[in-house]
Amino acid sequence: EHIDEVLARPKLVGQVFRKRVMSFQVTDSLQHTLKAIRKRKYTQFPVDEGDVFQGLVTTVGITNWLATSMAGTHFPRRTPILQDILHHEKNEVNYKFISRYITIYEAEENFKHGVERGRRFEALLITEHGKPHQKLIGIVTPIDIMKVD
């Protein structure tokens, strides 16, 4: 009976993953971001320029930036900003915007289709209708989807 209920009315991502989203600005320092990573235990952060979304910074992108920076003999003297890190993300587009009205099963399919096309999404970014100019109201990662019962 429970299975019938779940299949008949699957949960929507907006119900399950709605939360206050912590975003940064492209001019924020890497140091500031690392403090947030340590404090909040997040691995992806939306980055804006003013109110305009610019990309998703991940711990993988930070590691790629660090590896590139350390390839030379000198560590950069200027404190890196998130704009520097965005250029080192493995996929420039490592995210997809989705509507809060899609089901968790549709969200899972988005992750699967991304992998099938060779473009793995680090996160699905939830807005009212899946439009980039709308306010972010949640983030879903592949691990989040696996934890939903």
Regions found by a protein language model. Give the residues of each.
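Tandem CBS (Bateman) regulatory domains
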Residues: H2-M22, T58-E122, T141-D149
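Acidic (E/D-rich), amphipathic helical modules within compact regulatory domains
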Residues: S23-Q25, H32, A36-R77
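PDZ/PDZ-like domain segments forming the peptide/carboxylate-binding groove
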Residues: Q25-S29, L125-T127
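Well-ordered alpha-helical segments embedded in enzymatic catalytic cores
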Residues: S29-H32, A36, E106, N110
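A glycine-centered beta-loop-beta connector
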Residues: I37, F45-I62, F111, G118-D144
